Regions:
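A short beta-sheet element
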Residues: 40-42, 46-94, 98
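Hydrophobic residues in beta-strands and at strand termini
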Residues: 16, 63-64, 79, 124-126
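Amphipathic alpha-helical coiled-coil/heptad-repeat segments
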Residues: 121-169
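Generic structural signal for secondary-structure transition and capping sites
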Residues: 1-2, 98, 161
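A short glycine-rich beta-alpha junction/loop motif
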Residues: 54, 68-75, 107-133
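Sequence-specific dsDNA recognition surfaces
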Residues: 1-4, 11-46, 65
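Short, solvent-exposed loop/turn positions at domain surfaces
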Residues: 37-38, 108, 147
Length: 169
């Protein structure tokens, strides 16, 4: 855990609020300096998965593609790449199977929280690496398609709105 932020001022700061629920998309984050960070943070790299340990029902699991510091309310999980594909593990941590497992431990009323041993206690189905890699490639393609479709939907809505304004406005 890092407590002295000298040299880290320009690093992205990923708070739990910067991780979109269900998708893990990183949104609205700022730098360590911009946020005026004073409490301890964890260093993460593109090799890590960021798993939110508070309010596990929100299913906040991010796969960053940059280096930064994350909230102490998250676990930066470093994947052993010789036995597990990072994208495969990330999607498993977002799965209903894992969510059902982890919610059974979430026993605090005001701010549900899970501990590291509970996360590590999950028995992950681990197919051969080539199958995990195929899965990760497929998921990346699906994500690219989703982005392209969303862009088309946004453009179509914009066109529709402008036509409505032109004809009925």
């Amino acid at each position: 855990m890092i407590h002295n932020f000298e040299g880290y001022e320009g690093y992205p700061h990923i708070g739990i609020d910067s991780i979109e629920k269900e998708t893990g998309r990183l949104v609205g984050y700022r730098t360590i300096a911009d946020d005026g960070v004073v409490s301890g943070k964890y260093l993460f790299t593109p090799a890590h998965i960021i798993y939110s340990k508070i309010r596990p029902n929100l299913n906040k699991v991010a796969l960053p593609d940059f280096e930064g510091l994350c909230s102490a309310d998250a676990y930066p999980i470093l994947v052993k790449e010789e036995i597990c594909n990072r994208e495969y593990l990330g999607y498993t941590l977002r799965s209903k199977c894992f969510l059902d497992y982890i919610l059974a431990f979430s026993n605090r009323t005001n701010m549900p929280k899970v501990n590291k041993n509970q996360v590590e206690g999950f028995r992950l189905p681990l197919p051969p690496m080539d199958l995990q890699n195929q899965f990760a490639d497929f998921v990346r393609q699906v994500d690219k398609s989703k982005v392209a479709i969303q862009k088309s939907l946004d453009e179509t809505k914009l066109l529709f709105d402008s036509l409505m304004q032109e004809y009925f406005g």
